């Protein structure tokens, strides 16, 4: 029978993944992604953060390879959390493939610690004192006659803060509307149609959503936004609205080894945006170098700099991926999509498999934050470098990073902001 996992995520931007479960051998599933952060011990938090970063960059490289000339936006944490939730109900090789595909070493990290880590991460991201607006959670929509194992139900509730709802999948249109309305409400209308279609074989839909709205610590002035050229490559350009800020003090690093500049813009809460601007023609070199050690180096070597002028496009980009077709199998997650899938930890009454993993994401960046993001960081007692200007007028990478959880919430490649 079919099991759908849907993940949804919004970054005043929105991303949503969904997973659908059907009878074995059928293919019909959505996934919407969600993000999490860890609140366990410092060591456990660092381990989960490093693993999630490894997964984020590995997934990014797959997406970039298959979509070389398009915009990319996704929530790696949303995807990994949704798949980890599925693994709660998986056994044997099915479970091992999922967790190892997420970059966990099961000989070093027990399965229980992985789920506890994600649970702590979810809890830490839900702290009301965080000035960023973050809404994350999970929901299960269960066929009214399907008997879910009590242990799975309880673990998803306790560890992943999952709400449970009954649905009549024999009425697929009504069930689809129920799920999409729920996701739309949780993501402030950013993701309006996570699930495009269901059929009567569906038994369960798992939704994982994240909504993030960050306000720049120092906002851009809308009156300073002007029309400017954005160079798609050496021969093509487009006109885009370009935000401008003068005499900005923020953290910056020039990576000569990788031929790129890294700039940090902070939000008012615990998140910041890392903007990576490769030199002309060096994007592939930077992409190939992405790994946890690269991120640690950048964050460690960023230092306060005064920028005479910063230009950053105002943009909105969206992506929609079918991850079960090739991306996840290439990362080692295969059996869960086949008749051999063992999801007997979810229910013993039906034989389930995952038929589709769909990830939907939206990212808006404007003058006030993400939906736009801007920030500054000044460290007293440290001499600041002075940079004449930084122009994001060619393809660049955009990473939303939660400093407390040391985790990547969103990652994007802006090839064309128009």
Swiss-Prot record:
Residues 1-21 form the signal peptide. One of its GO terms (molecular function) is serine-type endopeptidase inhibitor activity. One of its GO terms (biological process) is response to peptide hormone. SUPFAM superfamilies: Serpins. InterPro entries: Serpin_CS, Serpin_dom, Serpin_fam, Serpin_sf, Serpin_sf_1, Serpin_sf_2. The record marks 384-385 as: Reactive bond. Expressed in liver and secreted in plasma. Glycans are attached at residues 39, 105, 185, 270. CDD domains: serpinA3_A1AC (cd19551). It is found in: Secreted. It holds the Pfam family Serpin. Its main location: secreted. The single human alpha1-antichymotrypsin gene (SERPINA3) is represented by a cluster of 14 individual murine paralogs. This is Serine protease inhibitor A3K. It comes from Mus musculus. The lineage of its organism: Eukaryota, Metazoa, Chordata, Craniata, Vertebrata.
